[in-house]
Amino acid sequence: MVPTGQVAEKQACEEPRQDRELKSWRWLVFYLCFFGFMAQLRPGESFITPYLLERNFTKEQVTNEIIPMLPYSHLAVLVPIFLLTDYLRYKPVLVLQCLSFVCVWLLLLLGTSVVHMQLMEVFYSITMAARIAYSSYIFSLVQPSRYQRMASYSRAAVLLGVFISSVLGQVLVTLGGISTYMLNCISLGFILFSLSLSLFLKRPKRSLFFNRSALVQGALPCELDQMHPGPGRPEPRKLERMLGTCRDSFLVRMLSELVKNVRQPQLRLWCLWWVFNSAGYYLITYYVHVLWKITDSRLNYNGAVDAASTLLSAITAFTAGFVNIRWALWSKLVIASVIAIQAGLVFCMFQIPDIWVCYVTFVLFRGAYQFLVPIATFQIASSLSKELCALVFGINTFLATALKTSITLVVSDKRGLGLQVHQQFRIYFMYFLTLSIICLAWAGLDGLRYYRRGRHQPLAQAQALSPLEDSVQAISLQDGDLRRPQPSAPQLLPEDGSVEDGRADLRVEAKA
């Protein structure tokens, strides 16, 4: 039996250590959020299209040669950057992102040819792919119980940075009379400062997939291990002899779990929305500034529109958190309605030759997309482990990038149809209209099945349990607990999404 004095002495020693740890992670989170804010301060980003046209690049070169390089290179670097982010434990990829931004703005300031601008797009695609490092980094700093709050802090820092950057750029251009060249010089200065901040970030000791040595040292197992603990885990050396490496075994189990979860109707639905709607959304944001310049070459309120759309996106995303309906029944109808609204807004963009209509419709278009992003995030994550969430979001992003790359190759690239921007927007309108009709027909079929079975009988889709829920229910029954299982919902943010949001110029993706 431990004497009372020794217990009190031990508790007295533990309290200062806990206070130091609390102050330490709070400082790390604050520093990371400050870095995320400063990394978004690029006031020249909203004015890149006017800048390129002032540098004597033609609208055809910008539309059919320079911009198409962005989705091509993004598709090429997406998977390598995703793997390197986890393997190198985040910090090196954040430094790489800042270095790539430096290269982007040096090429903008010093480049004189189409090839230089295409190389600029390649470096920008690296910054887009590297956004996953920022959103994932914060989860390695805190305990799972703090994920939701820390994710909101990091997201708010990014949105605030995008908003301030857009407002600053518009004020400098409209009131200060600063040229777009000088605006890009100011952006380069902010980027160099954010690069210096990235060098002092703490490199985590662990990551989600590759750096899992903490398991050997007695740390908590991953969520997949908790879901399927098995009869017992062999010693590390024995496991290495049996499977080669612990990493290979972990990835195999993840893929196996992913195959089981594919049968969930809600998961399939929202993943399909993510792929198809994201592809169309980013195609619009890539080319919308070219459309504005053609509609009215005199007015230049790109920064103000970016700021307004960012603010509305934050409001709609916040509002989505309070929507409480039976998603198993109404998901398809909600998706169809939002996509139909997007189709109507795209139609107004290219059909009504008024720059203010173009501005307003784009702000509403971004807000409509951002309204469904948090809903889709929760619907996908609500019955998956944290590891599977990261994998599913990565696959969704890759498929969306592949789709928009294919559309770009056919519609925009000079080696394809090489259409002008108004013709492209007409095709994008048909794209969103087709998606809305498909979703509406799908929702109608579900509604007919629902009323044929009787209003008081739930849909079969809503009754299906995910593998995670099955495992939780099995464990509950074994323990004699007959209560209904309540699967946890890990709070993960997509690439974000950043916020995969955007630069409302050639590459609004970095601000979404």
From Swiss-Prot:
It comes from Rattus norvegicus. One of its GO terms (biological process) is folate transmembrane transport. InterPro entries: Folate_carrier, MFS_trans_sf, SLC19A1. Residues 400-412 are annotated as: Required for substrate-binding. The modification Phosphoserine is found at residues 466, 471, 476. Residues 479-512 are annotated as: Disordered. Glycans are attached at residue 56. This is Reduced folate transporter.
